[in-house]
Structures are given as structure tokens and as C-alpha cells.
Design a protein with these regions (language model features):
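Conserved beta-strand signature within the Rossmann-like core of class I S-adenosyl-L-methionine
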Residues: 202-209
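Class I SAM-dependent methyltransferase Rossmann-like catalytic core
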Residues: 16-26, 63-87
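A short acidic, Gly/Pro-enriched loop at the edge of an enzyme's catalytic core
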Residues: 161-173
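Conserved SAM-binding strand-loop segment of SAM-dependent methyltransferases
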Residues: 148-160
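Core SAM-dependent methyltransferase catalytic element
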Residues: 244-266
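A short glycine-rich, Lys/Arg-flanked "PGG" loop and its adjoining helix->strand segment in the class I
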Residues: 189-201
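Conserved SAM-binding loop of SAM-dependent methyltransferases across substrates and taxa
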Residues: 107-119
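Conserved class I S-adenosyl-L-methionine
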Residues: 96-106, 124
């Protein structure tokens, strides 16, 4: 009797988590129960009833939207999550010799992609792993092992606002949709400066984040000019949200509609 070999697959997760969908769906159910009770047992109070009914419709729409967005991000859908990550990867201008740092590595997806692209490099992934996304150091290490790059990757728990590395430690520094999530730093530009601190002179950087979301980055062009004046002359901004592979349904401000890439050489 032949034995079947079970091939392990890496688990990188989805930017629209099942936990988020469950929470929104639970709120929808809660409003539905309240709405039914109001219409059945409470005479009058029409404005309140209409308000709750609208909340039922809103949360139902949100649940459906997030399910659809999760599908679009997934490999089974339009694979948008991978394509956004690959766009960052394509902007890395590096010969692959030395060390690279991935700030906010999550499940290790970008760290591992870099390790697979640059066979002579060692890649360090850092993340705070507070549990909000379901990622962990263990998952990163397991994904790295499955992908065959565990000997050239390592993962460290660290705060992006206080990286545990000396100045000029890395030949390349990247970050993918992380800075806006860092709670320990209100000023997101400080995170860019901290990332550049550990980059060697002449090293390349690629940072992808919600750079067009003004609540996080109110004066982006001004900060780019400050970086240029500080000596980082080679710096470019790319509007990821205009990419043709991103469906219109995802081009909302809280999804992929405000994503951009800052990249260049220190």
C-alpha cells in the first residue's frame, strides 16, 4: 500500500482577518435582534427604529464587503495581497550581498520572498506580534522552514520605534504596511527616520504604507524634502493605489486606496 506524502504549505494569512469578519458579523446579529425587538414590542419611537434598521443594513453590507475583500486579497481570488508585496519587492535595488531588515514582518511573507530572491543574503524580520493579526514568531520560523530559507532568516520581537540594532547595520531595509500600525509612535515620520538609522550609507530602502492617508502622514511631500536635505537625495514616491491589479472595490481609503511606496538609496 502506497503512502502519501503530505506537502506542508506556508500560512501567510490574509490582511482581512477572519476575526474582523466575525466581529462585524456579530455586531450585525446584535443589531438585528435589537431591531426585531424594537419593531415587535415598542410602539412609536420611529426615529430610533429607523436608526437601528439602518445599522443592521450597514453592518450587513460591511460583513459582505469584508468577505469579498478577503477573497480579492487571497490567492484563490485576485491575489492582490501578493501582488502588492511583489510591487515592493520589485523596487529593491540591491545586489543581494549582505544583510536586509524587514520591519513588521508579520507572518514572514516579505522576509521569505527577499530570502528566496537573493540567495546570498541574510534577512532579519522584526515584529511586535501583539496578537491582533494572529501572526507570531513561531509562524514566521515555520513558514521559513517550509520555504527552505530558514538558514538565512531570523526573526526577532522588536518595536519599530526602537529597533535593537546599531546605526548602519543593514544593506537593505524594507517595511510593508507596518508604520501606520505602530502604537508606540504617534509621529509616523519618526519610524521612517528610525528605519533609515540602521541602514548603511549607500544601502537601499523600500517602505510601503498608507502614505496617502493624511491622518497618518499629513505632510508627506515636506518630509520627503527634509530627507533630501538630510543627504538622502535618491528618493522616489510611487502611488501603489493606482496599480491596475488592484480592483476598484479595494481602492477605498481604509483598504488599498491610500497605499504608496517610498524607496531609494541612503
Amino acid at each position: 500500500m502506497e503512502s502519501k506524502t503530505i506537502t506542508q504549505k506556508p500560512e501567510y494569512g490574509n490582511w482581512v482577518s477572519l476575526e474582523l469578519i466575525r466581529k462585524v458579523f456579530f455586531i450585525f446579529l446584535l443589531f438585528t435582534v435589537v431591531d426585531a425587538a424594537l419593531w415587535a414590542w415598542l410602539p412609536g419611537w420611529l426615529p430610533l427604529k429607523i436608526t437601528v434598521t439602518l445599522l443592521v443594513l450597514f453592518t450587513l453590507t460591511a460583513t459582505i464587503y469584508f468577505c469579498f475583500a478577503r477573497y480579492l486579497f487571497s490567492p484563490e481570488g485576485k491575489d492582490v495581497q501578493n501582488q502588492i508585496t511583489d510591487l515592493l519587492l520589485s523596487r529593491i535595488s540591491w545586489n543581494g550581498d549582505g544583510k536586509a531588515l524587514d520591519i513588521g514582518c508579520g507572518s514572514g511573507a516579505l522576509t521569505i520572498k527577499i530570502a528566496k530572491k537573493y540567495g546570498n543574503a541574510h534577512i532579519t524580520g522584526v515584529d511586535y506580534w501583539d496578537g491582533s493579526w494572529g501572526y507570531s514568531k513561531k509562524r514566521c520560523e515555520e513558514n521559513s522552514r517550509i520555504e527552505g530559507v530558514s538558514s538565512r532568516t531570523d526573526f526577532i520581537k522588536a518595536d519599530a520605534s526602537k529597533l535593537p540594532f546599531a546605526d548602519h547595520s543593514f544593506d537593505a531595509v524594507v517595511s510593508n504596511l507596518t508604520f501606520h500600525e505602530v502604537k508606540s509612535s504617534r509621529d509616523k515620520y519618526d519610524l521612517i527616520d528610525e528605519a533609515l538609522r540602521v541602514l548603511k550609507n549607500g544601502g537601499c530602502f523600500v517602505f510601503q504604507d498608507l502614505f496617502l492617508f493624511r491622518a497618518c502622514y499629513p505632510h508627506l511631500n515636506e518630509h520627503i524634502e527634509l530627507l533630501r536635505k538630510s543627504g538622502i537625495g535618491n528618493i522616489t514616491f510611487l502611488d501603489t493605489s493606482k496599480s491596475s491589479f488592484i480592483p476598484r472595490a479595494l481602492k477605498l481609503p481604509f483598504m488599498a486606496g491610500t497605499i504608496g511606496i517610498l524607496y531609494g538609496t541612503k
